[in-house]
Regions:
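Short aromatic-glycine motifs in intrinsically disordered, low-complexity regions
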Residues: 4-16, 87-88
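Catalytic strand-loop segment that frames the active site of acyl-thioester-processing enzymes
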Residues: 17-61, 66
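Helix-adjacent hinge/juxtasegments
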Residues: 55-78, 83-87
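Generic secondary-structure microfeatures
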Residues: 42-46, 71-74, 101
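Beta-strand-rich interaction surfaces with strong enrichment in secreted/lumenal proteins
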Residues: 10, 57-58, 102-104
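Short amphipathic alpha-helical segments enriched in hydrophobics
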Residues: 13, 29-32, 48, 74, ...
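Hydrophobic beta-strand-centered segment that forms part of the acyl-chain substrate-binding groove
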Residues: 1-3, 74-104
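Short coil-to-beta-strand transition motifs
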Residues: 14-21, 91-94
Length: 104
């Protein structure tokens, strides 16, 4: 699969606005003979609610939301790896992360 629109993403992912952090899948490779990978896009605008308090006058996307966007992309990739045989109720959970640091 080469990519996906927001409509195609919503058919696969349970997340919805404001917590769906994928706007487009640019590429998604699930060939079992190769390394599976995904390239996704989130359109971030200055109007995002989290910029109001993080940080006033110096907007920064919170690191935990960046991590969540990565987890959602990984979940989408997992769904594509399962393929058409997946149960429609299948969902991937991000179990956690250790020693994560966010730097500028």
């Amino acid at each position: 699969m080469s990519g996906a629109t927001i409509e195609q993403i919503q058919r696969v992912m349970p997340h919805r606005y404001p917590f769906l952090l994928l706007d487009r899948i640019l590429s998604c490779a699930t060939d079992p003979e190769e390394n599976s990978n995904i390239e996704a896009l989130k359109n971030v605008s200055i109007n995002e609610n989290f910029f109001n308090g993080h940080f006033p006058g110096h907007p920064v996307m919170p690191g935990v939301l960046t991590l969540e966007a990565l987890a959602q992309a990984a979940g989408y990739l997992g769904m594509m790896m399962i393929g058409e045989a997946r149960d429609p109720n299948t969902i991937f959970y991000f179990a956690g992360s250790d020693n994560v640091r966010f730097k500028r």
